Regions:
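Short acidic (Asp/Glu) and glycine-rich catalytic loops that position anionic groups and cofactors
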Residues: 103-106, 164
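Conserved, well-structured interaction surfaces
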Residues: 10-89, 105-120, 124-140, 271, ...
Length: 315
């Protein structure tokens, strides 16, 4: 397939990732998938606990208005986690606050609801967030109405194609009422205070954190600020830093020639048919007839080009 990168790494604990690289022998019990399943359901469990607590203590502790908003925020997060689950695993057990209160998790099976029904439950949570939350929040990272609209558009877009039509190339099976909802919620986002930054590269720089292009983002923290041992950080950034020559470090997500070639363009459009027939790569300061999608230079570190737009860090 196109747009491949190489896993990299050579430790014995990296073998679980090899099936993803060759797209064979993938099972739900291999490390990365099993861990993803566990962590997402752990997050859903926390959401359910929060909903039960809000229902029991919210009005007396927070007041009716704030309780209603916090419930909407938690339901957004639960839907976010379930959206990830259904996208990766498709068949998943629906465990909500009622299942949690009745302690019937082990009796809840992954075939109790159809793909359509699961999406409808996810949509219901996002819809609650859309109906209740304001368009803006004063605290960074708190979800809002526009974030819910974005997810509703994504959900209806997947539902519109229909279940079981993965190999279908026509459009007659598409649900037009769902597609209209995609358009409607997309319009909400398009006419909101969110939008594209003027410079594509800015979205990768820390000074543009929570910019107008960031609709929903996890908020990381330093251990000095949150009283944890290591802080709430993005560990993947640590694994993919730029190390000096002869320096030790990690070696993950190595770009392949195929990935670079996928950024070739012709007349402003991607070269879908023959992009990988002749391997090539751009060289800074040496113009060629081959044109490239500028996103390549934000995706792959290449010799003669600076890392993170700093000339002193030219590779």
């Amino acid at each position: 397939t196109s747009d491949d990168c190489l896993k990299g790494g050579s430790g014995v604990n990296d073998t679980d990732y090899h099936p993803f690289e060759i797209w064979k022998n993938m099972t739900s019990t291999i490390g990365p998938l099993d861990e993803l399943w566990y962590r997402l359901f752990a997050a859903i469990s926390r959401c359910n606990r929060a909903l039960v607590s809000l229902d029991k203590y919210g009005n007396s502790k927070l007041g009716e208005t704030e309780t209603k908003q916090r419930i909407a925020e938690v339901k957004f997060l639960r839907a976010h986690f379930y959206y990830k689950l259904i996208t990766v695993f498709r068949k998943v057990p629906w465990i909500d606050e009622e299942v949690f209160k009745n302690n019937t998790q082990e009796q809840t099976h992954n075939d109790a609801f159809t793909y359509q029904q699961l999406f409808e439950k996810i949509i219901a949570d996002f819809q609650t967030a859309y109906d209740v939350l304001p368009e803006t929040q004063t605290e960074g990272g708190r979800v809002n109405k526009i974030a819910a609209a974005s997810y509703l558009a994504k959900c209806y877009l997947q539902l519109a194609w229909g279940d079981g039509y993965e190999q279908t190339t026509g459009i007659s099976h598409i649900n037009t009422s769902y597609m209209q909802k995609v358009v409607d919620y997309t319009d909400v986002v398009s006419h909101s205070h969110y939008g594209y930054l003027e410079d594509y590269g800015d979205i990768f720089l820390p000074e543009h954190k929570n910019s107008k292009e960031s609709i929903f983002a996890v908020q990381c923290s330093d251990y000095k600020d949150d009283n944890t041992k290591f802080g709430r950080a993005n560990w993947s950034n640590t694994l993919n830093g730029c190390w000096g020559i002869w320096s030790c470090g990690w070696d993950f997500h190595k770009p392949s020639q195929n990935l670079v070639d996928a950024f070739k363009t012709k007349n402003g459009l991607p070269e879908f048919e023959d992009f990988d027939q002749t391997p090539a790569h751009p060289v800074n300061g040496h113009p060629t007839t081959q044109k490239w999608d500028p996103r390549l230079f934000h995706t792959v570190g290449m010799p003669t080009f600076p890392y993170k737009y700093e000339k002193q860090y030219t590779l």
